[in-house]
Amino acid sequence: AIFFASEPGTDAARQAERDLAEQRRQTDARISAYHQGINSLMADASFESSVEASIQSVRQGLDNLDSLRRAVDSRSIAAGDSATRYTTLIMGLVDRIPLIIRGSTDPELTREVNAYYALAEVAEMAGRERAIGASLIRSGDFDLPTLRRIAGLAGQQEGYFNQALAMFASGSELRESLKKGLNTLASQSLEEKRQTLFSSPSGMYALEASEWFTTTTDRIEGLNGIRQSILEELSSLVEH
């Protein structure tokens, strides 16, 4: 979104290109890990047809990722269309989680997978907020519908976060980690930036798109750290 919002040939566009290249590098590393993990799982276990269909759909989407990136680089695809295709790919992964939950008969395992699913939704909504907010700030156009969309994404994140909290017993280590996630420096900084953004046009003009992007990215990385802790706990439950 930031890339599309920047004027080609400007310093902002060059910075957006560098940021995009770094994002892609990180994404490629995660895709490689995903392929290794899913191939290992499929070699050792069988899945019901709905899960297998989800795996195949995501594989096809990842196979088409390079062509989508080329279309973005050449600006031959509209920003909205590219966002839709990226979102569809990501949600293919997120929506697989309920399919897995459906087959679980262990109450504790089900709760933790539900918590992971809720945090995956938080991370997805946070990613959208990152892109839309940075693009809006970069554009300099105070747009109320876009602001309402950002506010809605913030509300959805809070709802899913509360769902994740509800999956853990009071005092549990993972519940405490989740609660701390609400009070990180990145979370506090983002909340301040949200309030500034929503205050008035002058508030929006006081923000920098790069700072919004960095702050939201730091918060997402913190969320992903908590998700990783849940995965490790899930692995322990499955092994025992």
Segments predicted by a language model, with ranges:
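Hydrophobic alpha-helical segments
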Residues: 1-240
